[in-house]
Amino acid sequence: MLHIKSIPAFNDNYIWLIQNSDRRCAVVDPGDAAPVLEYLAHHELTLDAILITHHHHDHIGGVPELVRQFPGVDVVGPKNEPIPTLTHPVDDGDQLELFGEVFLVLGLSGHTAGHIGYVGDAKLFCGDVLFSAGCGRIMEGTPQQMFDALNKITALPQETEVYCAHEYTAANIAFALAVEPDNQHLQQYRDQVNRLRAQNKSTIPTNLRQEKFINPFLRYTEPSVVKSVSNRTEQTDPLSVFTALRAWKNEF
């Protein structure tokens, strides 16, 4: 069984640490090496692998220093993105073994052109694609690509835990409630998140079952969501509703 720990970085990033029972570990999207090295030293862990979801600096900035400190560490990441430190470029459908668990690589283009995720042991590391109550900005891809990426994620088992890379939940809930002010699941989740954040606790991981009740970007066929965006698009097909939602969130 793998154990997952969060290492906070910058203002709102999470670097995820995946640990086995033998004090060996991997990290996901280490934008900063310093907090990772501090955690590894404090807990006497050895770094075996670095998993990268996309090329943005707040996800890869710490990789060169970690490679210097741990020569021979595997650096796994998207083959279609400009990341010079990769030792193991991977793409959609590839598999990798990590501490006895098989992880499947998912192509999740949209936020960036070559964004990927990793799913295994009922855990999804999805970078900046799916957030709790939200989704990533479409910075290099198209609405269709992000739409397809989210649908690929929602096809996973509903118990899948979602480890996204940022603590955006409270802000996402504010937007989600603007879309669905009468959503009781959202109202309850807002209260839960407010309690956690008041104690400086993380709201992540979330899970797919919960997100389907609260995340407007997964609820684009719900009548309440379609009605909310009706003044922004005359189309009611799922992609048009999703695209209108993402444009609305950009200016929210």
Curated annotation (Swiss-Prot):
Residues annotated as signal peptide: none
Pathway: Secondary metabolite metabolism; methylglyoxal degradation; (R)-lactate from methylglyoxal: step 2/2
SMART domains, alphabetized: Lactamase_B
Binding residue positions for Zn(2+) 1: H54, H56, H111, D128
Superkingdom assignment: Bacteria
Catalytic activity: an S-(2-hydroxyacyl)glutathione + H2O = a 2-hydroxy carboxylate + glutathione + H(+)
EC number: 3.1.2.6
GO MF term list: hydroxyacylglutathione hydrolase activity; metal ion binding
Record keywords, A-Z: Hydrolase, Metal-binding, Zinc
UniProt-annotated binding residues for Zn(2+) 2: D58, H59, D128, H166
SUPFAM superfamilies on file: Metallo-hydrolase/oxidoreductase
GO annotation (BP), single: methylglyoxal catabolic process to D-lactate via S-lactoyl-glutathione
Cofactor notes: Binds 2 Zn(2+) ions per subunit.
EC top class named in words: hydrolase
Cofactors (names): Zn(2+)
InterPro entries the record matches: Clx_II_MBL (IPR035680), Glyoxalase_II_hydrolase (IPR050110), HAGH_C (IPR032282), Hydroxyacylglutathione_Hdrlase (IPR017782), Metallo-B-lactamas (IPR001279), RibonucZ/Hydroxyglut_hydro (IPR036866)
Keyword Hydrolase recorded: yes
Keyword Transmembrane: no
Entry-linked Pfam families: HAGH_C, Lactamase_B
Family recorded in the similarity comment: Belongs to the metallo-beta-lactamase superfamily. Glyoxalase II family.
Function, in words: Thiolesterase that catalyzes the hydrolysis of S-D-lactoyl-glutathione to form glutathione and D-lactic acid.
NCBIfam families referenced in this protein's UniProt entry, alphabetically: GSH_gloB
Quaternary data: Monomer.
Record protein name field: Hydroxyacylglutathione hydrolase
Organism of derivation: Vibrio atlanticus (strain LGP32)
